[in-house]
């Protein structure tokens, strides 16, 4: 198999949205990270250090992930309401 064929058949990483539980390509989802310092942020580039979780880029999936506490379980941290509102604003942008 040539290098060109390998590049064409290369698999893209798949991740599951915490809100709707739909499996999508990693680059279609938004990564939320708990940094080593304990801060919860939206990782736009997908390269921040820390424990990550993925959701679709819509507010409904974030609401569902928060309501079911899936986001807190995935990040292993309690998330204050102020941070959730900040995440919602970041995702909408």
Regions found by a protein language model. Give the residues of each.
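Processing junctions and N-termini across compartments
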Residues: 11-14, 50, 55
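A short beta-strand motif that forms part of the nucleic acid-binding face
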Residues: 34-36, 46, 60
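Short linker/helix segments within small regulatory modules
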Residues: 38-50
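Cys/His-coordinated zinc-binding microdomains
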Residues: 21, 57-62
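N-terminal first-folded block
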Residues: 2-38
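C-terminal structural segments of small proteins and small subunits
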Residues: 63-93
């Amino acid at each position: 198999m040539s290098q060109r064929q390998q590049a064409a058949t290369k698999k893209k990483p798949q991740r599951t949205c915490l809100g709707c539980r739909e499996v999508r390509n990693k680059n279609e989802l938004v990564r939320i990270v708990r940094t080593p310092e304990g801060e919860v942020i939206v990782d736009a580039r997908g390269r921040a250090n820390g424990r990550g979780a993925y959701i679709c880029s819509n507010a409904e999936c974030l609401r569902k992930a928060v309501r079911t506490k899936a986001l807190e379980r995935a990040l292993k941290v309690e998330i204050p309401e102020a941070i959730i509102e900040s995440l919602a604003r970041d995702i909408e942008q």
